């Protein structure tokens, strides 16, 4: 029992971290599945979501800040796609990659400018950040919530992709981009929606991750 009490918090923390990275990975792979291009700015969107929460929580109640962070993060992902990717839809792949890297550096430097490169204290989220006891071992509730929430979101995403029209359009675009476009699928809307979903997952992952550390850094997720 003593060994379990000693090691259980580390096991739960590892599972929780795995859930956080899973949310980020799903966002990466969704974009890659359609564009066949890694969205280098995705980790920066994760970082920006944390900083948005820091500044919004200082100006409004947490119950209002939480949905606002998600909405603003989704809007950021949508804007990145519209500004950095859509104009280069017919451009060589290298041009799109350079644009993606440029957006990544832009968000990083903007974060450094706003924060001065100083880590910011993340607000403590009620209930989520509370300490609980499991089998005699103390851990934060977020370590238990994260893998469960990740599983729920992944199942919801599978249902979205398999059972809805937009999901069918996403699958068609990932199989054959040009043929899907010829069949009447609005590729631009599908891609923008994919970026929005990926950014939503990044926002949730950011909340879960930084709720555990209570510290957000003006640098991208590596």
Describe each PLM feature range:
Residues 213-219:
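Conserved small/polar residues in nucleotide/adenosyl-binding loops
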Residues 60-103, 110:
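Alpha-helical transmembrane segments within multi-pass membrane transporters and channels
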């Amino acid at each position: 029992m003593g060994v379990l009490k000693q090691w259980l918090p580390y096991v739960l923390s590892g599972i929780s971290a795995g859930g956080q990275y899973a949310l980020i990975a799903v966002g990466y792979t969704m974009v890659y599945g359609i564009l066949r291009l890694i969205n280098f700015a995705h980790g920066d969107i994760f970082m920006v979501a944390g900083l948005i929460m820091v500044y919004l929580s200082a100006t409004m109640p947490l119950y209002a800040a939480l949905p606002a962070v998600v909405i603003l993060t989704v809007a950021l992902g949508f804007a990145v796609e519209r500004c950095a990717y859509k104009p280069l839809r017919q451009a060589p792949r290298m041009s799109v990659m350079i644009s993606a890297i440029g957006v990544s550096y832009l968000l990083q430097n903007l974060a450094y400018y706003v924060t001065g490169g100083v880590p910011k204290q993340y607000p403590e989220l009620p209930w989520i950040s509370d300490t609980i006891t499991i089998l005699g071992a103390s851990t934060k509730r977020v370590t238990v919530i994260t893998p469960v929430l990740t599983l729920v979101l992944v199942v919801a995403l599978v249902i979205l992709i398999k059972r809805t029209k937009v999901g069918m359009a996403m699958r068609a675009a990932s199989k054959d981009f040009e043929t899907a476009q010829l069949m009447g699928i609005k590729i631009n809307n599908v891609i923008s929606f994919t970026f929005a979903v990926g950014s939503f997952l990044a926002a949730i992952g950011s909340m879960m991750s930084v709720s555990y550390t209570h510290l957000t850094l003006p640098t991208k997720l590596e």
